[in-house]
Structures are given as structure tokens and as C-alpha cells.
Amino acid sequence: MADLTTEPISEATQKGSWVSGLGSLLSYAFVLGLLGLLGWGLIKVNSGQRDSGMAPDFTLTSFDGETVTLSELRGQVVIINFWASWCPPCRDEAPYLESTWRKYKDKGVFFIGVDYADTEKEALAYIDEFDITYFNGPDVGTIISQEYRMDGVPETYFVAKNGELRGTKIGPLFPPELDQRIEELLAEPYAGE
């Protein structure tokens, strides 16, 4: 009987082991590639702005301690604006948002400002600088912005009286865009009226 520990391994056996190992490695790489593509596809399905379907419900606490829950605003047109004090385009649209709010606040329209990734001190200074009177609060933990799949600030969501999203605006709003959107939403019939 031959001693297996001292017998040399044949060249064919070495080549066969190498080919077998390479085949296994390629199989693993293929499976990992497929899993990666599947995961990427799932991420892409769940990303991008929300601009239709029911608006994700949330409760926001304002800087002065008041709360608002989106689903409790049924029957009103709701404008949700994500902003930050450090955002130059947010500063560009702030006067228009406030003047539009004042124009429509008694006509069945509710504005919600969601402050994104900001300090309270800076956010309050921004609100004071632009004399903003509509409801505003911080997105603590960025929970609301994640739910809305927000890309950046400013970003505005238009919610119909029945709670459905009717579109998204990425970037600053300028006259007469917001007025037009609000008028369209106010004209929509609502079963609760």
C-alpha cells in the first residue's frame, strides 16, 4: 500500500482541482451578481418621489408645541413644503409661499412647512426673517422626509381634499405655479362636501 502523504500529486489532478475551484468561484460570483441586481431593483422600486396615491400620514409638532396630523385635514387642500434655513432656493421661494398662504388660508387650504436637517435656532430665525405664519415644525430624525422619499430641499407636495397626492415640485416655487395648483385642487369635487 502506498503512502499517500509522500506520493506526488499528478499534474492532471492539480489542473482538475484548479478548474473545479474556478468553476465554483464563477458560480458564486454569478449568484451574488443576481442577488445584487435583485436588491438594486427592489431599492429602485421603493425610491423616487411620491407623486400619486394616498399621501403618507404623519403627525408633526410645530416649533411652538402644537401638533397636526395630515389625515385629520381631510376636506382641505394641503401643501407640504420641505425646507431648510441653509438652503438658498428655499429662501427664494419663502416670500411667495407665505403670501400664497395668506391668500388661501381662509379658503380651505392648509400649509405645512417641514424643516429638514436644521437646528431649531436657525429654523426659527428663518421663520422670523420671512414672517412665516403657516404651520412649521422640524422633521425629527428625518422620518417624514424618508416617508415621502424626498430628494432635497425645497420640495413641495400637493395633497387633494381626499388625501391623495396630486403632484410634487422639486425646487423652488415661483408665481403663479402654486396659485394654479391650489386652484386646480380646490376645484376638485370632494365626497365630504
Language model region names:
Residues M1-D57, E193:
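N-terminal targeting signals for export/organelle localization
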Residues I79-N81, G113, Y157-F158:
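Hydrophobic beta-strand core positions in alpha/beta domains
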Residues R74-Q76, D106, I132, M150:
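Active-site acidic short loop of glycosyltransferases
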Residues R91-F130, V140-E147:
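Structural microenvironment flanking redox-active thiols in thiol-disulfide oxidoreductases
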Residues L70-R91, L97:
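Short active-site neighborhood of thiol/selenol oxidoreductases, capturing the structured segment around
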Residues A125-T133, P138-Y190:
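Thiol/disulfide oxidoreductase modules built on the thioredoxin-like
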Residues D57-V78, W101:
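A short beta-strand-turn-helix
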